Each structure stands twice: as structure tokens, then as C-alpha cells.
Amino acid sequence: AQCEATVESNDAMQYNVKEIVVDKSCKQFTMHLKHVGKMAKVAMGHNLVLTKDADKQAVATDGMGAGLAQDYVKAGDTRVIAHTKVIGGGESDSVTFDVSKIAAGENYAYFCSFPGHWAMMKGTLKLGS
């Protein structure tokens, strides 16, 4: 099974992957984020935050208040299944989570919680059959 996925982000606030299906035989799953743009993280930083789809907007809103030093993720937010750090152009980061944290039939979303990005920079994640 392919127990990882790579998502590229750019200076135009886009992810190149809109859907990730996690093979249910995977015990752990790794999400790799690459910033293929040129801009610095203070201006055009991106991260990858995984939550239930229903929690996406609230987590993004709370994350804005956390600031760049906290990677725009509220400390101790139990709605966050996994997240990368905020990266700038030419950088990359990865995060691994236990597949037991996601359930079949539930809709999950991954998004960038950098202020103003989440509405455009998002995708769906689900457990495969």
C-alpha cells in the first residue's frame, strides 16, 4: 500500500492535489508538503492541517490568532488530527499520523491555515475501502 502522499503548494495559493485516499491497510500515513514557489513564508507561507471537514473553518479561524510562531494552529487544538509547520518557497515538511485517527465514511479536509488561504487551499481526505 502507498501510505504517503505529496502535496505541492505555490505562490498562487494552490495545492496540486485535491483528494487523498488513505489505504485502510496502512497503520500510519505520511503527508509531505512542498512549497514550489519563491516567496518567503511571512508573505506566502503554507502549511497542511488535517481535520474533520466540519471543523475546517473553525480551526482555520482559531489558527489565525495563534500566529506564525505557532504555525497558525491553536496550541492543543484537539480537532487537529495532524499538521505541518508553515513553510516558504523552496521548503518542505512532512507529518505522519495514525490511520486509526480517521474513520470510514467520515469526511476529512486538509487545508492551509495561513490567514486568508484556507478557502482556496484545501482538499479532501478519506479512508479507502
Swiss-Prot record:
- The answer to whether keyword Disulfide bond applies is yes
Mostly located where?
periplasm
Q: Does the keyword Electron transport apply?
A: yes
Q: Name one GO molecular function term.
A: copper ion binding
Q: List the SUPFAM superfamilies hit by this protein, alphabetically.
A: Cupredoxins
Where in or outside the cell it occurs: the entry states:
Periplasm
Task: List all disulphide bridges recorded for this chain.
Answer: 3-26
Q: Which InterPro entries does the record cross-reference, listed alphabetically? A: Azurin, BlueCu_1, BlueCu_1_BS, Cu-binding_ET, Cupredoxin
List cellular component terms (GO).
Answer: periplasmic space
List positions binding Cu cation: 46, 112, 117, 121
Plastocyanin-like domain segment(s): 1-129
Q: Which PROSITE patterns match?
A: COPPER_BLUE (PS00196)
Q: Which UniProt keywords apply?
A: Copper, Disulfide bond, Electron transport, Metal-binding, Periplasm, Transport
Alphabetical list of Pfam families matching this protein: Copper-bind (PF00127)
**Stored PANTHER family:** AURACYANIN-B (PTHR38439), OUTER MEMBRANE PROTEIN H.8 (PTHR38439:SF2)
Function summary: Transfers electrons from cytochrome c551 to cytochrome oxidase.
The molecule here is called: Azurin-2
| Species the sequence originates in | Alcaligenes xylosoxydans xylosoxydans
